[in-house]
């Protein structure tokens, strides 16, 4: 069949030829490929019978690859020989292909190259290329695949029918090919294992004959083929599992090739071939690109044995990813485990001296020059053995040739790694000279060895070691394994792109770039950064001459590569290289010092070393001594004579001496005569003697000669199996049996050393050379025939079952060419030998095109092999995998390989074929500047005007890269034909584009040339137009040059007349082009040529704006110096500063501000630079702007503030910065923070910090407000990854709230919060501790004890817990005793207890500190100054109000309103707080808490919010309309939705909910006891206010215990009320809203009767609260409460001193207007924001009202005093208060009284003041401090302390106040209401009438209306502004005015409201009068109330 098909082919018949669908450069689909391969296998495997189609010539592509064709065979080849003759010839020559024996072999038994490959690749099979591993886990081809270079897995006969493994994943990167290459390295242990059983199997097969043995043997041979692993013990790793680790870059298939100097570059093919590399290419094929898919991939199916092995590999233990670079495995047979190293210390000493010299011309390295066998390799190996890589010597040193491989102990330490000793393989011999000298020389050697970081051996018979890519890869792999360079290794692991850069694939494509960027530059940078030791490092390279044997046609050898790269080496990286004397010229370009080892006569040290070696050998062997002694004795004379004789013969060759002594030692030489005639005279004679002894007859040598021929011809070491198969490949009849083969190989074992990877290597390069080449006059006996070896190897490749991989195809071509078996046949047959060779290779493999386009053959092409592949049918237009799948011609044109280009063009390659980017070969050549290739292509009519996909022609590419000669040539080319065809693109267009291209790149010569072209009319060539823009980029020459900063070109163009103002196609003039890029020198040039520095572009932007936008500081400064206007705006109203802020360029911002740029400029959208900076997100710019006066609360036209923008853009650093600078958290802020957990954490943490700050200062109520508000704002869902953070934060907030509640005597809530914290964090000892303290405070000692025991379990070493545990145990005992002695203690006891508690572990701050661990650390760290989010710290440091403001701006306006109004706005808030907090510590609690509940609201946080806090504001804090308050009211219509602000809260938890919560709190024995038993209540812990008051007044403890009780009860009731808010009366009674107010008053009175002032304060606070209901919580009628309230108010008033008021500038409250407001507040507080009173009286009133900052101080202080009491009360008033307070905002922060609602809470008369965080820091502090009984003025106003307590708050005596209050109880309440306009408005709620206190925004419509008018003005926008601005609206001028107007107007609305609510009005009026009187009295009193509303109300 084959003969027939051959005939068909020769006659031109296409006998069913299978084209491999190669036309398009794509291989046939896998299925077709499969069939063709299968058919091939069947052809050779099944009896050798194959169909014609199988054997038909299969060109890779449809294009006939050979001249042979059907019609014109004769014409091209001349008269052909007869078909039979030609066929016979081919059959004879190729008969081996069809050997009959083959027919007997079952297909499964056939040896296939693929199987071999499998074996080769098995080790690598499971490995991935370094790069591919990084990107995907592509496995390299299965070991059985010819594509893989892994050693084949041993298989039995049945295993042969293997199919290829599945194709790797398509995701593999280009690097995937490397896996093959690198994979070729395998593990020693694996190979050992494999070869063991492979060998056994092969023996069995051997007896069977046929080819079976090949398979098994081959497999083991292959396994040895590429065998190298630094990890000897490691077995193969699964490629899939451990991709990177396994790629051993060891050159798997060592190429054994013939030395160059013996033949003219016989192994040139090696340059392009390296199995690994091919694998590399093969891996590329795996990339599933149709054109690149490997044809063999899908084929062989795995056989059993193979599968087992795979499994074994797959389950290898996992190892973490490692560097993907794997060093080559070097093994040097001449360095054995028995080698001896003697002397030569002088060499190391000289090397050391030279490398350390200061002479830069020689200190970069040393060249060691010597003849073959003179010890160069031993010197290098000695240094390696002593270096950090010494453990690798076990790989380098071979086992002794005489040791049986069976006995090799892979784990044995090689002597090379140890210090020289008698037993060491390389021992240092005695060296002449003094011991000191030897010591120094020894030190030099060890110093050098310690500096060695990498090494490389070049071995001619292992081609891979001679190739530059492998060299680079190996050196990098060893460098990263050097202990001195761990930083380099870490960098490679850290930067995978560096590993990719060093992958074998990258090294093949551009070894110089890989070495420079992957090795030298990283090392240099690490050295500069001092990350690697500051010392010299050495790279060793042995045998540079050997690498020359494999010099590629194109590309570098290792020595030429080093010559080019040495200039880039850092001074501390040295080289030590060796070279043979005969080839030392190749190193002449290396600037190294040279040391010669063969100048024996010149160097006495050499003689001494030889002498020492001879002495060592004689003394170490008795056999030698016996054989050289004449009479059995060795005397000095004999020794001297012998030594001299041997030294003379050796001429310095240690190899000669070693081999000679070996012969003597074994008895082959006996020197009994003194003539020594038997001693061989040269190394050649030594080898001859050895062979004569080994092969005494010619026939015995002939038996092994084929083995030697194959070994000599191979490019890399082969395994026994491979050699066996190659030998049998040449036999047509009767194959060699395995046993016979093994016997022959055993005879060669001393010459072919088995390496650790089971491959065979010649014992020494010199022996290999001796076998193939002899000098003249030498005997030619034992000469081998390399051609025969090439022939056998070619036959062997041809007999592979499947398709060869790329590398194997290249190798096959190499061997075919070297074999040249058709030599002389062409004349006989009439067919040229080259065509026959082409036929041969085409029959033998399918992947010719892929081999031609393989990576190595592209970058280091082998011209001859490439020609052979093309003759065989390779597709010359095949698309490669590089340069965008460019055809081969494109790649060769790009690389400048003229010969390859000519070859491709010769065979008709498409001259205009383009890559995927549209670039043709002409474009690539022009871009690279290869004029010769451009000329070649143009001669072939390449299209000059072809445009790539970027629209660029070849001329433009040449101009872009500055190739003037190419530009000139292309312009002179004929463009007419192309132009006519395309029509559109003309030569003039190309020239214009070339001008712009050259100008942009700064090529002045090309620009000048193009501008000087003759005019069009003069010649055909058209000159470029200097002011025109091109059709490609749309640039003019000047805009292009200016934009790229090409100053010289700009000068040239301007000199040539370019127009300065000529715009490009987009309308940009040169000035803008250059400013945008920051080239100020060109700006200067253009300005000097008349450009306008302030010209504007289409958008109105000036050059200064452009430069600022781009961040070019130098250009900005230059433009400013040139007079650029800093104030100009573009069409959007943006200035240069705006642009700089928008882009975040701090340096430019600083420069512009320093030059006077306005930081407050607003653009057309109202955005200031701060807004834009917050949008961009640069915290430093934001900080700078704020520090330089930018308005932090500025609102743009869309209602956004900088903080809101930062939150919206998720710029966390800016958010933190703005919060630190005092930005307020408004509703918009919360809204924008939705779904942004990171921002929410920041905002909540900010609230928590504020709370912590207040807590530290003792302002418990304010702190609780913050915490409560934060809890209210907690996101309900979507925590995601931040769940843990949020949980911790919530736990912290709950615990802090618990502490605050406890300090406020709200023990039930305290306990509840602690319980909730425990639910969230069951193992929290802090939560147990907090709950225990709460329980202890409520006298639940047993329960407290249980919690403490749990806490101590969780934290046994906490002293606080231990201390409290002891106390509680003691208390339990006392209680038991008391119970035994007497009935339960009267209610008073609790108070006693309370004081105790307070005094005990709980000093005011103690709580925080006791459990401070977490909370303080996490939240207290921030500066206290930052506490107030809303207010500027400086304005009211002490006030929580500012903070409150931000809280009020909680996402929901209502919420904010709620917060501000009820919690902050009114005492209710505080009461509510206690209630709500009590009610539900959780959300419910908070929600229900609504304002009151959340301590945050109650706290100054909310006070600060007052501006926005005011009910309206809060309700609609951002809505700007009071109605929101109403809206909130809507939600809880019953009472003026006191929850008003809390509307949302209430929604979340309906009032009922809150009620229940409060109830539960009330339920707590304390609270409810309070309600039930007033008398007890006093004793019980009081509300925070009362508690605080208690502390100061405990001693005095007024008889008013009842009021205190009331207070306490009120908290409980208040809470209840809260929930019940609808019925204000109930609230009053429960909470004692009025009671609260009154209650507070009472409790305060009771507590502080001694110091009435304080009591007054508390009372006044109570009054606010109390106003809610007619009946006070304690049960007193509202009148009573009022009385107490008024008394409180009076007290407060009185408490205020002029000094106090002044202390707080009115501006603190946003202006004096606030004070003026105050007076009005009396009547219409609720309705409007009142500016500060203008008149003194007003001021006083204000102060009494607490409206003024001073008042706020007072308020604050009272707050701190009464917070506990207030807490209880607020809950009650809360309902009304909410609604009412919504109406008014009195918080100091708020400018208007409308803040009253806030104020209410903030301002409770004095109590409210205490509760409210009014900026009065001093007052506040005092109040805190003065809590102690010592200061009578605990009332809360700074001056109060000085005043005697007898003076009531407003200067009215307590009694008077009470009296007035009682009569006006309702009025007073109302007055409270009046104070807060809301109160009046609240009338809608039942308790509102009496509840003036409830400042809830106008509950009544009238209130609302009024509120809308006044408050809206203020609350609406003003409120918002207030909310935003720390000083409040009043602070802002216009806003202040508005507030003033509002406040003034408010009186009328108040009246209106009063009318609406006559009763309320009456009360209000009365109250107002009283207040007026009080205020007058207050004025009389030392304190002049500056506070507007609170105190007046009181």
From Swiss-Prot:
The encoding gene: Tanc2
Subcellular location, record wording: Cell projection, Dendritic spine
Taxonomy of the source species: Eukaryota, Metazoa, Chordata, Craniata, Vertebrata
Record's keyword annotation contains Phosphoprotein: yes
Keyword hit for Repeat: yes
Entry GO terms, CC: axon; dendritic spine
Pro residues bias (residue ranges): 1382-1393
Annotated Polar residues bias: 418-431, 1473-1502, 1557-1576
Keywords: ANK repeat, Cell projection, Glycoprotein, Methylation, Phosphoprotein, Repeat, Synapse, TPR repeat
Per-repeat ranges for TPR: 1244-1277, 1291-1324, 1325-1358
Spans of repeat ANK: 846-878, 884-913, 917-946, 950-979, 990-1019, 1033-1062, 1066-1095, 1099-1128, 1132-1161, 1165-1194, 1198-1227
Tree of life domain: Eukaryota
Residue numbers of Asymmetric dimethylarginine PTMs: 1567, 1580
Glycosylated position list: 1932
Quaternary structure annotation from Swiss-Prot or TrEMBL: Interacts with KIF1A; the interaction decreases in presence of calcium.
PROSITE patterns: ANK_REP_REGION (PS50297), ANK_REPEAT (PS50088), TPR (PS50005), TPR_REGION (PS50293)
Compositional bias per record (Low complexity), positions renumbered to this chain: 1787-1802
GO biological process, one term: in utero embryonic development
Full protein name: Protein TANC2
InterPro entries referenced in this protein's UniProt entry, alphabetically: Ankyrin_rpt, Ankyrin_rpt-contain_sf, Dendritic_Spine_Reg/Scaffold, P-loop_NTPase, TPR-like_helical_dom_sf, TPR_rpt
Protein family per UniProt: Belongs to the TANC family.
Region (Disordered): 1-85, 417-442, 1372-1405, 1438-1590, 1787-1807, 1826-1847, 1972-1994
Function field: Scaffolding protein in the dendritic spines which acts as immobile postsynaptic posts able to recruit KIF1A-driven dense core vesicles to dendritic spines.
Residue(s) carrying Phosphoserine: 169, 238, 294, 400, 1446, 1462, 1534, 1549, 1583, 1726, 1828, 1831
Main location: other
């Amino acid at each position: 069949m084959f003969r027939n098909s051959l005939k068909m082919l020769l006659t031109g018949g296409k006998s069913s030829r299978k084209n491999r669908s190669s036309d398009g450069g794509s291989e046939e689909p896998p299925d077709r490929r499969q069939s063709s391969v299968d058919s091939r296998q069947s052809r050779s495997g099944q009896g050798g019978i194959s169909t014609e189609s199988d054997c038909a010539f299969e060109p890779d592509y449809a294009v006939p690859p050979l001249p042979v064709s059907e019609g014109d065979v004769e014409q091209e080849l001349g008269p052909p020989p007869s078909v039979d003759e030609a066929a016979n010839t081919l059959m004879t020559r190729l008969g081996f292909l069809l050997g009959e024996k083959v027919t007997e072999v079952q297909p499964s038994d056939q040896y296939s190259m693929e199987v071999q490959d499998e074996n080769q690749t098995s080790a690598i099979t499971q490995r991935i290329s370094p790069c591919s591993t990084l990107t995907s886990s592509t496995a390299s081809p299965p070991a059985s695949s010819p594509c893989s270079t892994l050693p084949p897995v041993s298989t039995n006969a049945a295993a042969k029918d293997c199919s290829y493994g599945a194709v790797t994943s398509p995701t593999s990167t280009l690097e995937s090919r490397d896996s093959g290459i690198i994979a070729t390295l395998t593990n020693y242990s694996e190979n050992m294992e494999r070869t063991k059983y492979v060998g056994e199997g092969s023996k069995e097969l051997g007896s069977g004959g046929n080819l079976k043995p090949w398979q098994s043997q081959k497999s083991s041979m292959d396994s040895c083929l590429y065998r190298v692993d630094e990890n000897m013990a490691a077995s193969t790793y699964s490629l899939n599992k451990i991709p990177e680790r396994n790629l051993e870059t060891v050159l798997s298939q060592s190429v054994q090739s013939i030395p160059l100097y013996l033949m003219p570059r016989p192994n040139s093919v090696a340059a392009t071939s390296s199995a690994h590399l091919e694998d590399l290419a093969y891996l590329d094929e795996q990339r599933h690109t149709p054109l690149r898919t490997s044809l063999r991939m899908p084929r062989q199916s795995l056989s059993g044995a193979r599968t087992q092995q795979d499994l074994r590999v797959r389950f290898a233990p996992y190892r973490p990813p490692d560097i993907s670079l794997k060093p080559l495995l070097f093994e040097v047979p001449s360095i054995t485990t028995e080698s001896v190293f003697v002397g030569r210390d002088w060499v190391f000493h000289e090397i050391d001296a030279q490398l350390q010299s200061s002479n830069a011309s020689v200190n970069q390295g040393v060249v060691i020059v010597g003849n073959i066998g003179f010890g160069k390799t031993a010197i290098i190996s000695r240094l390696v053995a002593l270096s950090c890589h010494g453990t690798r010597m076990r790989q380098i040193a071979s086992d002794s040739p005489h040791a049986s491989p069976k006995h090799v102990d892979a784990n044995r330490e090689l002597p090379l790694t140890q210090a020289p000793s008698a037993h060491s393989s390389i021992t240092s011999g005695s060296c002449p000279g003094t011991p000191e000298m030897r010591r120094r020389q020894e030190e030099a050697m060890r110093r050098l060895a310690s500096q060695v970081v990498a090494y490389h051996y070049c071995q001619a018979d292992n081609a891979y070691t001679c190739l530059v890519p492998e060299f680079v890869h190996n050196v990098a792999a060893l460098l990263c394994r050097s202990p001195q360079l761990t930083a380099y290794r870490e960098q490679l692991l850290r930067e995978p792109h560096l590993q990719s850069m060093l992958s074998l694939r990258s090294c093949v494509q551009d070894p110089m770039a890989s070495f420079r960027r992957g090795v030298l530059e990283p090392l240099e940078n690490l050295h500069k950064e001092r990350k690697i030791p500051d010392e010299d490092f050495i790279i060793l390279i042995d045998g540079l001459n050997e690498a020359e044997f494999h010099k590629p046609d194109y590309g570098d050898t290792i020595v030429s590569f080093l010559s080019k790269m040495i200039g880039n080496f850092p001074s501390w990286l040295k080289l030590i290289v060796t070279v043979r004397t005969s080839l030392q010229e190749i190193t002449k370009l290396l600037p190294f010092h040279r040391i010669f080892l063969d100048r024996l006569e010149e160097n006495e040290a050499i003689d001494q070393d030889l002498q020492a070696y001879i002495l060592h050998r004689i003394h170490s062997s008795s056999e030698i001594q016996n054989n050289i002694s004449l009479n059995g004795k060795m005397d000095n004379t004999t020794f001297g004579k012998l030594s001299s004789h041997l030294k003379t013969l050796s001429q310095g060759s240690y190899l000669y001496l070693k081999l000679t002594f070996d012969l003597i030692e074994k008895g082959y030489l006996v020197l009994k005569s003194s003539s020594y005639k038997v001693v061989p005279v040269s190394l050649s004679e030594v080898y001859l003697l050895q062979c004569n002894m080994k092969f005494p007859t010619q026939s015995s040598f002939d038996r092994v000669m084929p083995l030697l021929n194959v070994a000599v011809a191979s490019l890399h070491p082969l395994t026994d199996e491979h050699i066996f198969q190659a030998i049998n490949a040449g036999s047509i009849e009767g194959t060699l049996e395995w046993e016979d083969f093994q016997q022959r190989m055993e005879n060669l074992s001393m010459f072919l050393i088995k390496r650790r990877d089971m491959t065979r290597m010649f014992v020494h390069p010199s022996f290999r050379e001796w076998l193939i080449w002899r000098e003249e006059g030498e005997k030619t006996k034992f000469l081998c025939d390399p051609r025969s070896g090439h022939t056998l190897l070619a036959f062997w490749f041809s007999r592979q079952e499947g398709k060869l991989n790329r590398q194997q195809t290249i190798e096959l071509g190499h061997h075919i060419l070297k074999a040249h078996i058709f030599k002389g046949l062409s004349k006989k047959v009439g067919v040229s030998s080259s065509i026959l060779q082409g036929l041969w290779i085409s029959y033998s493999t399918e992947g010719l095109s892929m081999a031609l386009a393989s990576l190595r053959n592209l970058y280091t092409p082998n011209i001859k092999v490439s020609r052979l592949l093309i003759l065989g049918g390779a597709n010359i237009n095949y698309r490669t995998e590089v340069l965008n799948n460019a055809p081969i011609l494109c790649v060769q044109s790009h690389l400048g390989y003229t010969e390859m280009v000519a070859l491709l063009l010769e065979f008709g390659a498409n001259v205009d074929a383009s890559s995927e980017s549209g670039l043709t070969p002409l474009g690539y050549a022009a871009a690279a500047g290869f004029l010769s290739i451009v000329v070649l292509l143009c001669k072939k009519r390449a299209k000059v005007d072809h445009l790539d996909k970027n629209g660029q022609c070849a001329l433009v590419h040449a101009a872009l890269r500055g190739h003037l000669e190419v530009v000139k040539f292309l312009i002179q080319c004929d463009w007419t034909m192309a132009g006519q065809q395309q029509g559109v693109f003309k030569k003039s267009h190309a020239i214009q584009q070339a001008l712009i291209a050259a100008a942009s790149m700064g090529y002045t010569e090309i620009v000048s040339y193009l501008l000087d072209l003759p005019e069009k009319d003069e010649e055909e060539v058209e000159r470029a137009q200097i002011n025109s823009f091109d059709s490609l980029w749309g640039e003019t020459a000047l805009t292009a040059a200016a934009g790229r900063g090409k100053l010289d070109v700009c000068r040239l163009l301007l000199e040539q007349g370019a127009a300065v103002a000529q715009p490009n196609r987009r309308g940009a003039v040169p000035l803008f082009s250059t400013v945008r890029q920051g080239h100020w020198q060109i700006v200067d040039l253009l300005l000097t040529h008349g450009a306008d520095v302030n010209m504007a572009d289409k958008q109105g932007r000036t050059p200064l704006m452009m430069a600022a936008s781009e961040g070019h500081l130098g250009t900005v400064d230059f433009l400013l110096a040139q007079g650029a206007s800093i104030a100009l705006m573009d069409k959007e109203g943006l200035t240069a500063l705006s642009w700089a802020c928008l882009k975040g360029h701090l340096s430019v911002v600083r420069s512009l501000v320093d030059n006077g740029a306005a930081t407050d400029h607003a653009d057309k959208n109202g955005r200031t630079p701060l807004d834009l900076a917050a949008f961009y997100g640069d915290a430093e710019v934001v900080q700078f702007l704020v520090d330089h006066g930018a308005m932090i609360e500025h609102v743009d036209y869309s209602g956004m503030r900088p903080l809101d923008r930062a939150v919206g853009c998720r710029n966390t650093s800016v958010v933190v910065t703005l919060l630190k600078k005092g930005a307020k958290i408004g509703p918009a802020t919360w809204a924008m923070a939705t779904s942004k957990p990171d921002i929410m954490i920041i905002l909540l943490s900010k609230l928590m910090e504020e709370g912590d700050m207040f807590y530290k200062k003792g302002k418990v109520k304010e702190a609780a407000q913050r915490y409560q508000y934060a809890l209210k704002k907690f996101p309900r869902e979507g925590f995601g990854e931040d769940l843990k953070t949020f949980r911790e934060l919530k736990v912290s907030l709950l615990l802090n709230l618990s502490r605050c509640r406890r300090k406020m005597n709200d023990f039930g809530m305290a306990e509840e919060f602690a319980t909730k914290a425990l639910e969230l964090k069951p193992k929290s000892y802090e939560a147990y501790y907090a709950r225990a303290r709460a329980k202890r405070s409520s006298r639940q000692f047993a329960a407290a004890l249980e919690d403490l025991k749990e806490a101590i379990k969780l934290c046994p070493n906490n002293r606080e817990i231990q201390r409290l545990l002891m106390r509680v145990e003691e208390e339990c005992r006392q209680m038991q005793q008391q119970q035994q002695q007497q009935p339960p203690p009267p209610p008073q006891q609790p108070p006693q207890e309370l004081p105790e508690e307070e005094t005990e572990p709980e000093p005011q701050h103690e709580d925080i500190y006791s459990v401070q661990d977490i909370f303080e650390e996490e939240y207290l760290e921030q500066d206290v100054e930052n506490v107030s989010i809303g207010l500027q710290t400086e304005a009211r440091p002490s006030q929580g109000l500012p903070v409150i403001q931000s809280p009020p701006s909680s996402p929901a306006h209502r919420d904010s309103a709620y917060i501000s109004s009820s919690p902050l706005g009114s005492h209710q808030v505080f009461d509510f707080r206690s209630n709500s907090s009590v009610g539900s510590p959780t959300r419910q609690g908070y929600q229900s808490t609504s304002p009151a509940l959340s301590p945050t609201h109650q706290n100054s946080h909310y006070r600060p919010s007052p501006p926005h806090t005011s009910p309206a504001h809060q309700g609609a804090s951002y809505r700007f309309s009071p109605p929101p308050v109403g809206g909130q009211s809507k939600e809880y219509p019953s009472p003026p939705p006191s929850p008003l602000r809390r509307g949302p809260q209430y929604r979340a938890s309906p009032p009922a909910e809150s009620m229940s919560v409060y109830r539960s709190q009330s339920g707590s024995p304390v609270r409810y006891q309070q309600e039930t038993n007033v008398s007890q209540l006093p004793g019980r812990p009081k509300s925070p206010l009362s508690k605080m008051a208690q502390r100061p007044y405990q001693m005095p403890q007024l008889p008013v215990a009842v009021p205190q009780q009331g207070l306490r009860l009120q908290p409980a009731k208040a809470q209840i009320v809260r929930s019940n808010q609808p019925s204000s009366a109930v609230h009053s009674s429960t909470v004692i809203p009025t009671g609260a107010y009154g209650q507070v008053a009472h409790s305060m009175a009771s507590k502080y009767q001694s110091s009435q002032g304080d009591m007054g304060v508390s009372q006044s606070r109570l009054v606010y609260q109390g106003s809610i209901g007619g009946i006070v919580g304690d049960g007193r009628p509202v009148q009573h409460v009022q009385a107490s309230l008024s008394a409180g108010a009076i007290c407060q008033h009185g408490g205020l001193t002029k000094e106090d008021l002044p202390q707080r500038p009115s501006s603190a409250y946003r202006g004096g207007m606030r004070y003026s407001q105050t007076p009005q507040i009396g009547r219409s507080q609720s309705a409007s924001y009142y500016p500060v009173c203008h008149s003194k009286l007003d001021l006083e009133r204000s102060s009494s009202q607490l409206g003024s900052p001073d008042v706020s101080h007072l308020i604050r202080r009272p707050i701190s005093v009464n917070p506990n009491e207030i807490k209880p009360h607020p809950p009650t008033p809360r309902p009304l208060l909410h609604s009412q307070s919504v109406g008014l905002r009195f918080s100091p922060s708020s400018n208007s009284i409308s803040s009253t609602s806030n104020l209410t809470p903030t301002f409770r008369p004095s109590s409210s003041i205490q509760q409210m965080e009014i900026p009065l820091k001093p007052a506040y502090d005092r109040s805190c401090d003065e809590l102690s009984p010592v200061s009578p003025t605990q009332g809360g106003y700074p001056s109060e302390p000085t005043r005697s307590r007898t003076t009531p708050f407003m200067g009215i005596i307590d009694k008077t106040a009470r009296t007035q209050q009682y009569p006006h109880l309702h009025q007073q309440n109302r007055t409270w209401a009046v104070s807060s306009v809301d109160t009046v408005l609240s009338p809608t709620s039942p308790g509102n009438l009496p509840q003036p206190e409830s400042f809830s925004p106008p509950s009544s419509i009238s209130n609302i209306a009024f509120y809308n008018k006044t408050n809206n003005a203020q609350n609406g926008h003003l409120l918002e502004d207030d909310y935003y601005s720390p000083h409040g609206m009043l602070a802002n001028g216009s806003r202040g005015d508005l507030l003033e107007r509002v406040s003034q107007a408010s009186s009328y609305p108040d009246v209106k409201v009063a009318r609406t609510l006559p009763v309320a009005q009456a009360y209000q009026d009365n109250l107002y009068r009283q207040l007026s009187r009080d205020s007058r009295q207050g004025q009389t009193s030392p304190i002049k109330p500056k506070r507007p509303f609170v105190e007046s109300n009181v």
